[in-house]
């Protein structure tokens, strides 16, 4: 099976939902952020601080090019990966791209709660987190909207809600594959 890619804004649940989906349908799970950190023995924030965002994006792209060859793998991408160079084209050509989409207010609430673990929003107020998400959403939406599958994601406040979201993703993927086979 060709790779599945989960894309979406920060905080939408790509890693959380991705792990659950991969476990449920017996796929290997890869988070590109963790993959890049492991490969370069540094956190993303330290890579960006040291070498700049362009250098990080090049490393992220190299990881993507390697992962495009993966079989039976679900890949949760970094939020910005699809908009760099021709990454989205490559994902669409080599796998199934699933866009996890949530309302910005919901994402702002979620990100604000965990902001200490997210360098891009660590020092921001709730309002600034919302503004940040709106700004990056405007840039990324034209890329994200090209995904073959779009799944609306609601609250993820409990393990049960996370499992329900994972089931929604699985059903959306199944539905898409059935249409492709028809």
Predicted regions and their residues:
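A glycine- and Lys/Arg-enriched "phosphate-lid" helix/loop adjacent to the NTP-binding pocket
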Residues: 94-141
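Hydrophobic anchor at the beta1->P-loop junction of P-loop NTPases
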Residues: 6
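ATP-binding Walker
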Residues: 12
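ATP-dependent small-molecule kinase phosphotransfer cores
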Residues: 34-92, 117, 134
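Walker A/P-loop
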Residues: 15
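Post-Walker A helix-loop "phosphate-sensing" segment adjacent to the P-loop in P-loop NTPases
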Residues: 23-32
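NTP-dependent small-molecule kinase module
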Residues: 20, 24, 109, 138-182
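P-loop (Walker A) phosphate-binding loop of NTP-binding proteins
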Residues: 9
């Amino acid at each position: 099976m060709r790779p599945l890619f989960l894309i979406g804004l920060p905080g939408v649940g790509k890693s959380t939902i991705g792990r659950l989906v991969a476990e449920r349908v017996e796929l290997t799970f890869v988070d590109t952020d963790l993959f890049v950190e492991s490969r370069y023995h540094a956190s993303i924030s330290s890579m960006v601080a040291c070498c700049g965002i362009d250098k990080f994006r090049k490393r992220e792209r190299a990881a993507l090019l390697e992962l495009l060859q993966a079989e039976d793998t679900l890949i949760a991408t970094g939020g910005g990966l699809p908009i760099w160079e021709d990454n989205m084209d490559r994902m669409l050509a080599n796998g199934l791209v699933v866009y996890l989409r949530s309302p910005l207010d919901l994402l702002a609430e979620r990100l604000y709660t965990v902001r200490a673990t997210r360098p891009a929003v660590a020092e921001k107020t709730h309002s600034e987190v919302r503004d940040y998400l709106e700004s990056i959403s405007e840039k990324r939406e034209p890329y994200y909207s090209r995904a073959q599958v779009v799944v609306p994601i609601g609250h993820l406040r409990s393990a049960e809600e996370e499992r329900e979201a994972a089931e929604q993703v699985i059903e959306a993927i199944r539905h898409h594959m059935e249409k492709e086979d028809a």
